[in-house]
Amino acid sequence: DDKGNADPSKMGEIVSLLESIKGYDLADRMRDNFISSMQLASPEIMFSVRYLAPNTTHSMDLYYAAWTTCGVTRDLVDAFECTDGQKWGESPLTVPVNESLLATGELGDANKAERAKLFQNRDRRLYETVCHSGEADFSMDGQEGGSVTITNQMQTGFGMMKLIQPTKEMPSYSTISDADVIILRYAEVLMMIAEAENEANGPTQKVYDAVNQIRVRSGQPELPAGLTKDQMRERIRNEWRVEFVFEGHRYFQLKRWKLMDKLVNGASDPALPTYVKVFKPAFYYFPLPQSEIDKAGGVLVQDPNYK
């Protein structure tokens, strides 16, 4: 509805429809779905836009690695739990950091060492999703050697790891990228089951089973028993966030949940304090194009929130 609440009467039908989907499973690792050489065999990918070198390629490695056109905020890094399932900063596994060294995009040794502390004792998906200080560690993908320098610039000190292919050198104009772009994977089906079932009936075992499959895959503990419906909703929403980073879901989910004005408006990053996000209530809806209003001869009137 206009407050972001789900209609419980419709959720049961949605769950039944989602449970009728057969023939798919989770890949061994979340990141396996995004490595070009492993995508064709992935049991998780349901729909994707296919690429195949040398005729059909793109430049995501150049854009997201060398050029760092997709910045990563500290707020996103903090969204990933520690390995005990507790929030970073609340978990006893939290490694204290010098915030003054983190509030900058500088790539010096001291800054790098401090950022590395944020990556200790964390959900494995953080390592599969985010890199820092201009380097990426592809050893998890079976590549020998240590970290690889993939860029000489990161405005916040953090960058994308998830969609970058394993490499031994910084991507350049000659880098050919042909990883498929995923539209839908089975993990999303499980998350939709969990969200719809929780809205319909609260945190039933069906909700726990769906979410825990994804959590256990990443090495995280199962969700604690006894969560309320509201608590489960918050856990589900964070699970959506950390599992599907850079896959095009977050913006539309925050609009669907009517949380853009609460979580996005006024948001900034410590490394870029002069850049502050603005989101007005009117932005939940698209304005009528002025050209269409002009052609309608007075029949169409602009949303008053845009006036």
Describe each region flagged by the PLM.
Residues D1-I21, F47, L118-C131, V181-I214, ...:
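Extended, hydrophobic/aromatic-rich amphipathic alpha-helical segments that build helical scaffolds
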Residues D2-I14, G89-A110:
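Surface-exposed intrinsically disordered loops and tails
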Residues N5-A6, E19-I21, R31-S91, I176-I183, ...:
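Long, intrinsically disordered, low-complexity segments
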Residues S16, D28, S36, T149-T151:
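N-terminal non-cleavable signal-anchor helices
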Residues Y24-L26, G219-Q220:
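Helix-capping and short linker residues that terminate individual alpha-solenoid repeat units
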Residues D25, R29-R31, Q143-G145:
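Aromatic-rich beta-strand patches that line glycan-recognition/binding surfaces
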Residues P43-E44, T104-Y186:
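Flexible, polar/acidic helix-loop-strand segments at domain edges
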Residues E135-S139, P203, Q220-L223, V242-F246:
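Intrinsically disordered or highly flexible coil/loop and linker segments, enriched in small
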